Amino acid sequence: MDGNGRWANERGLPRIEGHRRGADAVKRALKAAQENGVKIITLYAFSVENWNRPKDEVDALMQLLDRFLKDQLTELVKRKIRLRVVGRYQELPEHIRERLSHVEAATAKFTDYTLALALNYGARTEVVDAARAIAQAAQAGKINPDELDYEQFAQHLYTKDLPDPDLVIRTSGEARLSNFLLLQAAYAEIYFTPVLWPDFDEKQFKLALTDYAARERRYGQTAEQLQG
């Protein structure tokens, strides 16, 4: 979800207006995902580094998030989409935590479609938190460090109940992952587009899926092995 600020700057608008338009793009992405049979969509809404932005922008982002969740609850329930939050949930403002908890509880029964919001998320922070939890479990005798494998490690990630992504879409022309799902995206296909997030619509979503469908996913194997 990158490019909101640049979108606004290019039009001589306040940065928060770019974020508002970005929220509209979220609604389009959810609609496009369902229409194309995408069961789980994870949106990088707020990173641990985003706290370094000007305070007025951070405050405005939190207000926008609160309003978005309030306005979209009925729509999520109507379309049977579960909300799942990944990140350092406990460090968000109290009113945001309460809103998120309410929406998560109201949509918890839905299983066909999931909107995962990465909030106060950072992949490196996630790894540190997982390592800390594993160390505590090992100290308590619940885990044997010598038997630890990736599957066990993954059970301590924020995304422990979500599958690894098949496709990562990076908007705004940036060619990097920016600390997003670094472990989980190890075998994901990555699609880069110059389109700024507020302009990312159903057509752009479909283009990304079409590009993904044309790729050959090898998982370390040769093309000959995949062909049987």
What are these regions (language model features)?
Residues 1-228:
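Flexible, compositionally biased loop and terminal segments
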